[in-house]
Structures are given as C-alpha cells and as structure tokens.
UniProtKB/Swiss-Prot annotation:
The cytochrome bc1 complex contains 11 subunits: 3 respiratory subunits (MT-CYB, CYC1 and UQCRFS1), 2 core proteins (UQCRC1 and UQCRC2) and 6 low-molecular weight proteins (UQCRH/QCR6, UQCRB/QCR7, UQCRQ/QCR8, UQCR10/QCR9, UQCR11/QCR10 and a cleavage product of UQCRFS1). This cytochrome bc1 complex then forms a dimer. This is Cytochrome b. A ubiquinone binds at residue 202. Heme 1 (or BL or b562) is low-potential and absorbs at about 562 nm, and heme 2 (or BH or b566) is high-potential and absorbs at about 566 nm. The keyword Transport applies. Heme b b566 binds at residues 98, 197. One of its GO terms (cellular component) is mitochondrial inner membrane. Its main location: mitochondrion. One of its GO terms (biological process) is mitochondrial electron transport, ubiquinol to cytochrome c. The chain crosses the membrane at residues 34-54, 78-99, 114-134, 179-199, 227-247, 289-309, 321-341, 348-368. The gene is MT-CYB. Belongs to the cytochrome b family. GO terms for molecular function: metal ion binding; ubiquinol-cytochrome-c reductase activity.
Amino acid sequence: MAPNIRKSHPLLKMVNNSLIDLPAPSNISAWWNFGSLLGVCLLTQILTGLLLAMHYTADTTLAFSSVAHTCRNVQYGWLIRNLHANGASFFFICIYLHIGRGFYYGSYLYKETWNTGVILLLTLMATAFVGYVLPWGQMSFWGATVITNLFSAIPYIGQTLVEWAWGGFSVDNPTLTRFFALHFLLPFMIAGLTLIHLTFLHESGSNNPLGIVSNCDKIPFHPYFTLKDILGFMLMFLPLTTLALFSPNLLGDPENFTPANPLVTPPHIKPEWYFLFAYAILRSIPNKLGGVLALAASVLVLFLAPFLHKAKQRAMTFRPLSQLLFWILVANLFILTWVGSQPVEHPFIIIGQLASLTYFTILLILFPITGALENKMLNY
C-alpha cells in the first residue's frame, strides 16, 4: 500500500500528530474548547493588528489622528479596529475560563504545560497593556504613566529602571515608539510559546473531567474534536461580531476619546476590565512597594498551584468542599473586578482589602487544607 503523505511528510506528519490522529480522551467537555479558542483569538488579533499597523503612526502628534483616520477613511477600518479592541476582551475571557478549567480539574499537575501557560498569561497581559497605550488617548497616557511608575517602587534601581523604560523623564514619544515595537513583537512570542505549550501538552495527553487516566478510551482528534472546535469558534465569533458591530465602545473608557494631555489628569484612572481584579489588589495595600508585590503575587501565585495540591484525587469533580471553595474564589474575583472599577473611597477601600485578603487566603491556605481534609473524609 502506498504510504500516506499525511503520515510520512516531515511537516504534515507534525500537523497530523497534533490535529488529526492525536488520541484524545472521549469524555472531554466544552471546557476543553478554550485552548483552540485562544489559538483562534491569537490568529484574529495578529491579522487585524497587522492591518491596523499598516495605517498607524507611532508618534505622539499623529497616533490619535491616525487611529481616527483608520476608522473614518480606511475601507472597513472601523470594523478592523472594533474587532481588534473587542477581540482582546474575548482573548482574556477565554484565557480566564481556560485557567479556571485547569484549576478545577487539576490540569496544573502537568507542571510544564501549566508553567508555560502562566508565562503565556503574563506575556498576553504585557501585550494588552502596551497595546492599550497606542491610541494615545487620555486613559492610554495616564494608564502608561501609572503602571510604568510602579517599577520605581523597586529599591535602589527603581527610578533608573523607569526612566530607562520611558526613554526620558516622562511618558513621551520614545515611550510610544517602543511600546508599538513591543506590541508588534509580543504576539509572535505568544505564538512561539503556544507551540511549546502544545508540545508539553502532547507529551502527556489531555486531562479529562474525571481526572483519571484515559489511555484505555481514546478517540482520534479528527473528526470529533475538529468539529466540536468549529462549533466553539462559531459560538465565540457570534458575540464578538455582535459586540463589534452593535456596541463597540461598551467595554472601553470614554476618557480615551480625548487625546492624551500630560497637563490634565482624568478623575478616575483605571485599566480595561480584564486587569481590574489585579488593579484592585494593587490599590488595597496603602504602601507602594507592598502594592506592587501584591499585584505581582496575584498572577504569580498560579505557579504555586501544583505544590498546593494536597488532595489524592486530581479533579474537583468528586470533591464538594473544594468545589464550594472554587466558586467562592470565582465570586471573589468578580467582587475584585467590580471594586477595581470604583473610586478609592469608603466602602470600596475596605471591600477591596477584604476581597484581596480572601483571594490569597483561599489560594494559599484554604485549598491545601480542604484537600487534606477531604482525604481524611474519604479515608485515603
């Protein structure tokens, strides 16, 4: 019989082993769709971003007008821009759900896959931050000023580091130019890290909702999961296009329709919604360095997940106490997100502080204790 080119060609063989003949657990649910959705988000963002970059000018005097020009005068420029801006929101929705899935089902026990995933999250956050600065509106400028300024809290080298990052003594033209360069570069770094992430995942194979070894019951990725993924794509693109076409500015800040002005500070400086939980944690500590450390810890704590797993069972599927704790954590994150969008005044200050404390307590203390307790209750 003639050899199948899909299985013999050096390049097609890799595609085949990753997307066609890949053995996948037969019982993975829709929660396993978010990986492929993130891949599609990345491709969409790179494509729309490339088209936007063709019309963008990274100069403080022209940046704002160049974005306006794209929306007014470029064929479907408004659509490309709206898809790119709201695509970022969907990227974060997908990555947060993807991480939540990993946390619930104990996927973090694949340490290499999990760690590359956390690095991917950090890179995505950096990309979104530098990208938000590019339209050079008021919130772009002041957001960049506030967040880059946080590095000055680092003892001894802080101030030097900030001025080095700015390329001067304040956020100005050199800052915008380098942020554009970084915003162009980082998505390709994300693409590279994604391949590493997948390489590690395919070493072990996927986890599944039962959290048990599924080698005895695997099915080919194609057609079962290719079809399921396509359904996922459709279900994601529907709300994305609806948002981009009907209310493209719903998630944005009205302040960003005003060109950047270093002499006027907006009344409430706040990031996009997907950073609000971390922003609330940052603000809940009255000390600058303490806030910066808490901000870093809010994401870096994910690296500790594999070491804090004390339960004998992998997934939370059959662990009701851990489930309760997990959903309390989710509710807590919603509270942090809401507090981050509110002004710094009573009662939001104390709510933010309590929610921040709860966040770290659940992750670092209550999850391991509950896991150990469930072992006792189940006579492990």
